[in-house]
Amino acid sequence: MKKVIFTLMMVALASASFAQENAETKLWTNKGTVGLNFSQSSFTNWAAGGQNALNWIGTLNYQANYAKNGFKWDNTLSTSLGYSYFNFKDKPIKTDDKIELTSLAGLKATEKLNYSLELAFRSQFANGFDYETDSTHRISKFLAPGYITLGLGVEWVPNKYFSMNFAPITGRVTIVNDSLLAEKGAYGVEAGYFNPNDSTDWISGKHARYEFGARLVAKLDVPIAENINFNSKLELFSNYLDHPLRIDVDWQNQLILKVNSWLNCSIATHLIYDYDVPFFEIDPATSLPSDTPIKGSKVQFKEVLSLGIMFNI
């Protein structure tokens, strides 16, 4: 499965690397950034107390877009990985981890509308833990979860700053490539259970969940002042087959202030709402997450403020 996912990621971007430029028209446009954001604190005989800490987040973003005779193919890779080290002896704490790949093929319908087919993949690089309860209790890893989405629809591009893709025919697969998490029903897959007709027969949890519905993705990338840029991505998904009014929400925002050609300051937020993703309460007897999941309307929210270096590639 890992080979399949990495193949999908590389096909979309490698094609652009070997594309030849037309003598009259540049068919491919490529741009990207690589960055490293960090902070550090150190205390020696500090009366008020404090913890030595080192925090870093690495990012890689790349776009490879093709356009010719009313046909376009837009490919975007967005990745980040970050850790915090306290006292430089304890196990590092993961603060950011993202792999997102989208590939959209569009055929011009009108001046501002395109027929579209979009493939999207989302997962993470490293293991994730519930650090508030037990730093050895793994709650995520590569492909646990992993999301693969394929949708057919229409894209509206009114200007160079905004686009919206609506795909009323969309299939989505949620992958949980971890047996322990699958048995608990993590990330909405069917949990393992005992056969009601035979209490000794354990039915294993599923490693994938399949959905069919509608997906809307709106993107905004606009300069709001000199050296200040704001970008936002809102993704909504409705599952036709199970409570279609329970809309999944994934909303990412980032404000970037460029100090100079390589130094920048940024603040990023990420909000997720998915009714089907269960949460596990803490068992007071063990101080560990309970084996009984709780489904419900919990909003996931993350905010990252960082200062660092960024270079164009």
Go through the PLM ranges and name each one.
Residues 299-313:
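Outer-membrane beta-barrel "beta-signal"
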Residues 44-48, 87-91, 128-135, 176-183, ...:
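Outer-membrane beta-barrel translocator domains and adjoining extracellular loop/strand segments
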Residues 24-40, 71-73:
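Transmembrane beta-strand segments of Gram-negative outer membrane beta-barrel proteins
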Residues 32, 36-38, 58-66, 101-107, ...:
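Residues on the lipid-exposed face of transmembrane beta-strands in outer-membrane beta-barrel proteins
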Residues 45-50, 85-91, 134-140, 201-206, ...:
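Extracellular loop and loop/strand-boundary signature of outer-membrane beta-barrel proteins
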Residues 36-42, 68-70, 79-85, 121-127, ...:
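Transmembrane beta-strands of outer-membrane beta-barrel pores
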Residues 71-73, 112-115, 161-164, 227-230, ...:
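Repeated loop/turn-to-beta-strand initiation elements of outer-membrane beta-barrel proteins
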